UniProtKB/Swiss-Prot annotation:
Catalytic activity: biphenyl-2,3-diol + O2 = 2-hydroxy-6-oxo-6-phenylhexa-2,4-dienoate + H(+)
Entry EC no(s): 1.13.11.39
Keyword Repeat annotated: yes
GO BP terms, alphabetized: xenobiotic catabolic process
Name recorded for this polypeptide: Biphenyl-2,3-diol 1,2-dioxygenase
CDD domains: BphC1-RGP6_C_like, BphC1-RGP6_N_like
Length: 298
């Protein structure tokens, strides 16, 4: 038994209202109410996938990974303890806030709070109604999407996420950060999604560079691009990645953490072999981050 998918993410932000507007009106998420877990947002039949809480860090506050059942949770708890990781069993109050049957909490080697859970709440009786025009998000067995973890030591992080949590390497991109600076980015999967997690020693102040949501059609991407571009928040133009072949754009959230919004990523199957790339994109993905940063400051 192992981790099945990325199930949810929680952000601590200084402007909850701005995030609410961005997630719903720009990206098409559905408001799911305000609870002790924060402002909740849906993208499918799950009760929530993203939580936004008041806080000053303007960053990812926690992430939750899903396992199939109680036995899977116990197995992951044992594996973490054997690796010397401090593990806490979530109490009834935390389980209620998260809307799960059971969970454990711990942290990765560089302090990101993580959770593993089973028995998430489904709300099929409440159809998903997007906050803006989008035909749907790709979730199911592939989970919520992915995020890119920024760490000071990628080897240490890679060992933790693969040896302890059980992620598998999909591929590596050597990211050229300057004339004489190359940073390898490692892309990891735990299901058919090409990567649920990426790890890189990017010199950034945030815990993550971006999180990704995958939508059902190219038109979904295009319409969202126009909505986000109207506010000057695009950080990277439309492009197609070399590794997962996703067509996407990047935009700045109100906290400065970026979001990738994409379509048509290829999946990993049993025939997959690890490869490496010298460039992150076949075409496009031209940076316009300076413009977005100026707009956020304004």
């Amino acid at each position: 038994m192992s981790i099945r998918s990325l199930g949810y993410m929680g952000f601590a932000v200084s402007d909850v209202a701005a995030w609410r507007s961005f997630l719903t009106q720009k990206l098409g998420l559905m408001e799911a109410g305000t609870t002790d877990n924060g402002d909740l947002f849906r993208i499918d039949s799950r009760a929530w996938r993203i939580a936004v809480q008041q806080g000053e860090v303007d960053d990812l506050a926690f992430a939750g990974y899903e396992v199939a059942d109680a036995a899977g949770l116990a197995q992951m708890a044992d594996k973490l303890k054997q690796a010397g990781i401090a593990v806490t069993t979530g109490d009834a109050s935390l389980a209620r806030r998260r809307g799960v049957t059971g969970l454990i909490t711990f942290a990765d080697p560089f302090g990101l709070p993580l959770e593993i859970y089973y028995g998430a709440s489904e709300v099929f009786e409440k159809p998903f109604l997007p906050g803006a025009a989008v035909s749907g998000f790709l979730t199911g067995e592939q989970g919520l999407g992915h995020f890119v973890r920024c760490v000071p030591d990628s080897d240490k992080a890679l060992a933790f996420y693969t040896d302890v949590l059980g992620f598998q390497l999909s591929d590596v991109i050597d990211m050229k950060m300057g004339p004489d600076v190359t940073v390898p980015a490692y892309f990891l999967h735990c299901n058919e999604r090409h990567h649920t997690l990426a790890i890189a020693a990017f010199p950034l102040p945030k815990r993550i560079h971006h999180f990704m949501l995958e939508v059902a059609s190219l038109d979904d991407v295009g319409f969202a691009f126009d909505r986000v571009d109207a506010d000057g928040l695009i950080t990277s133009t439309l492009g197609r990645h070399t590794n997962d072949h996703m067509v996407s754009f990047y935009a700045s959230t109100p906290s400065g953490v970026e979001v990738e919004y994409g379509w048509s990523a290829r999946t990993v199957d049993r025939s997959w072999v690890v490869v490496r790339h010298d460039s992150p994109s076949m075409w496009g993905h031209k940076s316009v981050r300076d413009k977005a940063a100026a707009r956020n400051k304004a």
